[in-house]
Swiss-Prot record:
Belongs to the cerato-ulmin hydrophobin family. The keyword S-adenosyl-L-methionine does not apply. Keywords: Disulfide bond, Secreted, Signal, Virulence. CDD domains: hydrophobin_II. InterPro entries: Cerato-ulmin_hydrophobin (IPR010636), Hydrophobin_sf (IPR036686). The lineage of its organism: Eukaryota, Fungi, Dikarya, Ascomycota, Pezizomycotina. It comes from Passalora fulva. It comes from the Eukaryota. Disruption phenotype: Does not affect the hydrophobicity of the cell surface. Transmembrane segments: none annotated. The gene is hcf-6. Induction: Expression is down-regulated by carbon starvation but not by depletion of nitrogen. Induced during invasion of plant tissues. This is Class II hydrophobin 6. It holds the Pfam family Hydrophobin_2.
Amino acid sequence: MNFMLLSAALASMAVAGPIAGTYPITYPSSNTPATYPSGNAPIWSSPIHGGNNGGNGGNGGDNNGGNGGNGGSGGGNTGGNAGNGGGNNGGNNNGGNNGGNTGGEGGNGGNGGNGGAPVELCPANRVPQCCQLSVLGVADVTCASPSSGLTSVSAFEADCANDGTTAQCCLIPVLGLGLFCSNP
């Protein structure tokens, strides 16, 4: 019902036409009500107020993100995030540059150390031999060199045992003869 009354009031104003007389409007320099010349004030003569001033614009977040550091291996990180935009319309926020160049290749590992000193299967000046022993425990006439690549005295003894011979360290192995032999 209120809507209908308002519609009727507006319609009657439109039909009535303009109000006689002119009313120059002066805008105050502050928010004080406007004044009108003597006579009837127009219907819309409530104090005129200008709209509030728009708020201050925010700071334009023009901070650029930092550059990524140089990576030691695998390249640096990309630049940091740009600063936040201030106010309604932030400034141009640029992300940082791509990460720095990748670091140099890692150095090559050093060479492995040499193996230990060669294994001495027999004391100095003695030659390893696999010999058949006589009944008295003295080396028989048949001796032969053990397999190559033996790495311990126990491997030397096992190698000779596989052939049914005994590991011996001989002073003079000549033509398959074991002379002056002893146990390793």
